[in-house]
Structures are given as structure tokens and as C-alpha cells.
């Protein structure tokens, strides 16, 4: 779905006021669900979630945390519901066999970095993570899902939009009232620059929660290859404009853009239309990694990969917090006979 513009406006906007009663009902139901006790997992569970619907940068955050876990000796596995995929799981994602229609787009990206389990039944998925010889689980999304007990939850916020109008769906972007979600959050991560993230940061500090800041940066080689090139940029993610901004920052000359709904299942007609326009205008088709896995392998599309970067003090804080969840077990290959 595409987020309606009034979500990012004031809460007194007419559509928001009309939908506010439904938002109170929906948000209250989610809040009550979040309060249920969850099953214990065989491994420490780190939840990367957000308080709003749509993209905030959870997948790059999960990948960055996996790197930090490896630095302190852990072997992470990712656990995902597999949004947009038809397989209920639990199943280990194999990019050579699975497509986005089966397991969703994010799991295909995560599986490049570590064992990735798709499971609508999160406790069953956690058991399969343990069977994959992981020592820690990174749950991509799931802050509002109570089925699995989390050891540490980090809420990701986009500094450009924050919590929007502060109302619960469908009146606004919140999955539940923010006051009901704070007790389930152990740290706040604000990605990018913008004033909308500052009220969230101030609220977190008042609650004694650490506030970590990070930036999404394009892969240098890919950015250099696009510098000065005329492009047709397209994306079906939570905030396509963020991707277009990244392309401009990389020096690409954006001649046209096309925004699709988040997790859009591209049809042959979509791609054919994009290719026609690109050929006619002499443009390079460019999209995100997440969109690329939803396209045919032979599609003539260039990708601009991005990754999340922390300052060293924030990276050190994260390493310390992750280490506090428990030491990684010794590698059996290093044990003396």
C-alpha cells in the first residue's frame, strides 16, 4: 500500500479526524496483543522493529547488527515473517530456489549475509535458527508480535518523517499508540537527518533509553558508476523519495522517477513500460536491492546498494549491549583435543 499524505500532516487534518475512532480501536487491539507473554527462544533474540507501518530502515539495520554480532564472536541468523511471500514456514531461505513470491523480498536480501528463516510461527522459526547453528537471532520486524519473547528490541525511526501525525492506523502511521509501544522498546535508532526524529529522541532520553544515530550510504563503487549518468529511477519501497535522494547524492542525473507501492509485485507490463521509456529517452534503469529481487533475473536494471553506518561511539555502545545478552559459545574448531 501507499501511505496517504495526511499521515505525515497534522493530526487535525480532516481525513485523520474522520478515521481517528477506527485508529483508536485498531491501536488498542494491537496494544493489548503486545502485552501478551511470549514463548522463550533457545537463543538470544534481538528484535529490529518500528512503531509505524512502512519502511524505516529495518533491513539495513538487521544487516548491520549481524556484522556487529560477528565482531563479538556470535553467529547470527535472521528470523522473518516473510511479508509478501506465500510460504508459511518455517523454512530456511535458499536464494537459488526461492523467489520473492515465496518468501518475500527482505528475506532474500538477508539470506545473502546469514542463515535466514521465514516463519509465521515465530517460536518454530526460532527453533530452526538454532538448528542452523546460530548463536543469536535477529528478528526482522515483529516488535508488535508477542509470540516470541525478545531479549532486546531496537525501534528504528526515519528522521525525515518520525511518527507522522502521531495517530494509529488507519488515521495515521502508528501500529499502536506510541505510549503503549514504549514499554517494549530497549533502544531507539534514528536513521538520517531531519527534525521529525528529534521529538522521538527527546522522548526516549526522558525514558532512559539509549538513542543511536546512523546514516544510509550508497556503496562507493556503484555510486561512482552512476555519477553523471542520466537515469530512470524506480522503487516500490516505503519511501521511494529516500532512494531518489540517495541517487542524487551519488551524482546520478535523474531524468524521470516512478514510485510503486511498498513490496510491489512487478508485472511484465510494469517492466515493459519502464524499459520502453528508458530506451526512448536513453536512460539507465536504476532501482533498489529490495526491488531487484522482485524482478526477473534478466531484467536490464542497475542497482544502487546502500548500507547502514554508525559512528564508532554508537557502534561500541551496540557491541556492548549485544555482548550483554550473553557470550558466544566457543567455536568447537578451536577446542583442544
UniProtKB/Swiss-Prot annotation:
The keyword Lipid metabolism applies. One of its GO terms (cellular component) is plasma membrane. It holds the Pfam family LpxK. Pathway: Glycolipid biosynthesis; lipid IV(A) biosynthesis; lipid IV(A) from (3R)-3-hydroxytetradecanoyl-[acyl-carrier-protein] and UDP-N-acetyl-alpha-D-glucosamine: step 6/6. Disulfide bonds: none annotated. It catalyses: a lipid A disaccharide + ATP = a lipid IVA + ADP + H(+). The keyword Oxidoreductase does not apply. One of its GO terms (molecular function) is ATP binding. GO terms for biological process: lipid A biosynthetic process; lipopolysaccharide core region biosynthetic process. Keywords: ATP-binding, Kinase, Lipid A biosynthesis, Lipid biosynthesis, Lipid metabolism, Nucleotide-binding, Transferase. ATP binds at residues 52-59. Transfers the gamma-phosphate of ATP to the 4'-position of a tetraacyldisaccharide 1-phosphate intermediate (termed DS-1-P) to form tetraacyldisaccharide 1,4'-bis-phosphate (lipid IVA). This is Tetraacyldisaccharide 4'-kinase. The lineage of its organism: Bacteria, Pseudomonadati, Pseudomonadota, Alphaproteobacteria, Hyphomicrobiales. The gene is lpxK.
